[in-house]
Amino acid sequence: MSTQTEPKLVTQIDFARAGQITPQMKEVAEREHRDPEYIRERVADGRIAIPANIVHIKKGMRAFGVGEGLSTKVNVNLGISGDKADAAEEWKKVKIAEDYGSDAIMDLSNSGKTRQFRQQLIDETPLMVGTVPMYDAIGYMEKPLVKLTKDDLFEVVRAHAEDGVDFMTIHCGINKSVTKTFKETGRLMNIVSRGGSLLFGWMEVTGNENPFYEYFDELLKICHEYDVTISLGDSCRPGCLYDSNDATETAEMIELGKLCKRAWAVGVQVMVEGPGHMALDEIAANMKLQKRLCHNAPFYVLGPLVTDIGVGYDHITAAIGGAISASSGADFLCYVTPAEHLCLPNAQDVLDGLMATKIAAHAADIAKKVPHARDMDDKMGQARRKLDWDAMWKCALDPVTGKKRYEESPAATEGTCTMCGKMCAVRTVNKVFEGTTIDLGMED
């Protein structure tokens, strides 16, 4: 008789491949109006990820699916910065993310001992939580960048996994081959990824290979142990229109596609990160190329920003690109705020960035025919036809702001707003069909 034991099922992929539908798959299916088997099949082959660390699940997190056939998810970045370390301000941003419908929060804290903030965030928020361990490494290990060892970096990754982080951005694809391409071909903006630039600097000074690439199998063991979804960071994303779709970006994307297969082979969930800055007419092709090279893994993009000169309004430049990218295949949008390229965003910036990105995601979902994506739009049309303002607030992505603006400028005529007053087109046509007098206030 064989004494070989069955492998332990830990990750969502493990269970999906064993034919088992987890509570998280059921939750995603219900929220997305999909059959649970639809979710299970796509988790099994990597087209859908459910970032849900086993530690965070025990704390009551909600399950979110990212990937093929699902609604486009939205992420809010926040975290304690060395130049403006104010934890109370960051908690205001957490509250905004939760109250206004973000699906995920990335804690990008890069100053001092960040673990307390991260642990409290995971304890308290039901949203997906992501981090970039490389940001934390210098403060965590209390060493200069060039003194960090492979073991130091992996210790930080393990600490984040133990704390319950659901997905980690790790820049595994920037290896010596990619950096060779980068140095040979050149770029206008070089490398604009913080984590990628740190690893590039470490590699250049030490002469060593990227440890996250060289010891990728060891990294996968940590991720599998806690069911951490690895979000393969795009160190070489374009930081300006000039660099988009260049040899360096493409070389890294090819490497990321290879790493996807290695992760899936051992039951680790994967997302792949993308641009960046990109001209409007290049976005759809880039999304299709990524899906092809990365075998339909969920794609997580930062916009892309469609112009480089929208300073102070980059939540708009990113939302334009985000609507195109998500309607062309991207699955997850990272928000961009008006403070992008300028400063650490404040709470209002976070709200503005989140709402712009949610609008982009929702517009894309309508275009992608995501089940029930247009339901609220149709209800809004009905409410507006009736001039039912209370019903309109219930349909709005941001009812608080809408109601506040409406009430700040009260109309003289009931049911209308101060834009048109008695000349409201909806009111006029309603009165025609009701057979009542069309009073425009000009008869006096």
Predicted segments, located by residue:
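Basic/polar N-terminal segments that are highly enriched at the extreme N-terminus
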Residues: 1-10, 442-444
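Alpha/beta enzyme core
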Residues: 3, 11-15, 20-309, 313, ...
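Hydrophobic alpha-helical segments with strong N-terminal bias
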Residues: 3-6, 313, 349, 405
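Catalytic or ion-coupling anion/metal-binding cores of large enzyme and transporter domains
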Residues: 180-207, 238, 242-244, 344-444
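C-terminal catalytic subdomain
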Residues: 309-318, 324-370
